[in-house]
């Protein structure tokens, strides 16, 4: 055996040992682009960049989303990659200071998420806020899921949301911008409505209707006109005490947020849904948004309050408690155009000629509280003349703020002509409302636009 062979073998064994004990080299994990992103970072990005990020991260269903919806989708993807759940809903703050995120039609449900008092105080959260964030499942002694971290409030960064103003502190002014409701030359409901009772942003309107006069159809046409011509408006249809099949039909007919509590549900549930819908609208207006609520009907909402509120010890005609009038008046009175920006428009249907003294009393209490009224006529409905608008009784206060000077002059001329057609003649050959309305609709059908109709009316004189 050579002299150096022993030393060489020992060295070889030590090198082998080092090779065996050396940690294997691993490739570093690629950094997740979504990991460090917050709501404010995503808001600062352009829509094109957000879509590129969603495509690169293999997020499905992003191509047709608006910016705010795409941001929420990316936040959801970020949360789920951490192994957590992502949830949210409309906040309902209780008197104890805690809150719950309502996920089912603005009403209490088994999937509600608990929000702690500290989170509500930190971000100045209010009833009606749309809150989304990281959610954990309930522990053994808990009933609801709990909100761990708030990612967004009403679609914006929660740190910015806590600096918004309060609805009561905003300055109400008259409506100054009219809604364009016409979607087709053949939609005579919208065309006639824009002439006799224009609707502006911030309008407080009452649609007075006997049964079967087409009030639901009028609401649908208004909703379709707003959603098609004013996509920036947040449209809410609130159905209280309606039939379930009508709720389904409305949901399929309009591109709007449909909130409902049908007649077979309790009065307390109907009141809860209506109040949550109003609170949701107020929170959006505080952010400068334009919101429209179509309420069907304020009569049934008042009836529900009449069963829920504590008795005042007094009773009006028809069994109506005076205390039951204050909450629906507060709902209707919330409509306003905001000087600082934003508006809340409320168009509510009111039932008359139902044979109920209570319904007549409710109408008498709300008559004159709005700044726009649209009356539907029973005689026109009986003759199946639609839209069954009572032109003489319908109108908008301060319509000169919504119509141009020339259009206003022509509309006044139209009203004078309609009144003369209905005035009784000495010979007994005067027109009644049926003949006058038929003549008006006949002339309206001969033109494709309201401007053409008014110009033709002026030239014929």
Give short role names for the model-derived ranges.
Residues 109-117, 183-189:
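Short, structured beta-strand/loop micro-motifs enriched in basic residues and often containing a Trp
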Residues 125-127, 137-207, 213:
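P-loop NTP-binding catalytic core
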């Amino acid at each position: 055996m050579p002299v150096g062979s022993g030393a060489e073998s020992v060295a070889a064994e030590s090198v082998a040992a080092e090779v065996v004990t050396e940690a294997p080299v691993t490739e570093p994990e690629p950094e997740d682009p979504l990991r460090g992103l917050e709501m404010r970072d995503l808001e600062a990005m352009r829509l094109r960049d957000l879509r590129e990020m969603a495509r690169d991260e293999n997020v499905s269903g992003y191509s047709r989303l608006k910016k705010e919806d795409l941001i929420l989708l990316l936040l959801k993807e970020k949360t789920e990659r951490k192994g957590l759940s992502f949830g949210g809903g409309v906040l309902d703050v209780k008197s104890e200071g805690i809150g719950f995120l309502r996920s089912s039609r603005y009403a209490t449900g088994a999937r509600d998420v608990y929000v702690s008092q500290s989170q509500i105080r930190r971000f100045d959260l209010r009833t009606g806020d749309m809150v989304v964030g990281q959610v954990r499942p309930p522990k053994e002694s808990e009933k609801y899921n709990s909100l761990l971290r708030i990612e967004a409030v009403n679609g914006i960064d929660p740190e910015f949301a806590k600096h918004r103003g309060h609805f009561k502190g905003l300055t109400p002014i008259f409506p100054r911008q009219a809604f364009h409701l016409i979607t087709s030359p053949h939609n005579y409901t919208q065309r006639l409505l824009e002439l006799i009772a224009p609707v502006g942003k911030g309008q407080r309107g009452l649609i007075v209707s006997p049964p079967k006069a087409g009030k639901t159809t009028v609401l649908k046409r208004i909703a379709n006109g707003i959603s098609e011509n004013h996509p920036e408006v947040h449209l809410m249809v609130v159905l209280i005490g309606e039939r379930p099949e009508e709720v389904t039909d409305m949901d399929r007919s309009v591109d709007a947020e449909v909130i409902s509590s049908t007649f077979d549900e309790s009065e307390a549930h109907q009141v809860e849904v209506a109040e949550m819908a109003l609170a949701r609208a107020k929170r959006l207006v505080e952010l400068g948004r334009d919101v429209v609520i179509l309420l069907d009907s304020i009569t049934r909402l008042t009836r529900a309050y009449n069963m829920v509120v504590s008795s005042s010890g007094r009773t009006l005609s028809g069994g109506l408690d005076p205390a039951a009038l204050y909450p629906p008046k507060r709902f209707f009175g919330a409509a306003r155009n905001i000087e600082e920006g934003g508006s809340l428009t409320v168009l509510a249907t009111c039932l008359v000629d139902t044979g109920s003294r209570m319904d007549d009393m409710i109408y008498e209490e709300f008559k004159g509280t709005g700044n726009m009224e649209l009356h539907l006529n029973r005689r026109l409905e009986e003759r199946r003349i639609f839209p069954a608008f009572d032109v003489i009784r319908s109108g908008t206060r301060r319509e000169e703020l919504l119509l141009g000077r020339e259009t206003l002059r022509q509309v006044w001329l139209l009203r004078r002509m309609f009144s003369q057609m209905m005035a009784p003649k000495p010979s007994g050959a005067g027109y009644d409302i049926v003949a006058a309305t038929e003549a008006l609709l006949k002339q309206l059908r001969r033109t494709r636009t309201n401007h053409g109709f008014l110009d033709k009316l002026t030239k014929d004189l």
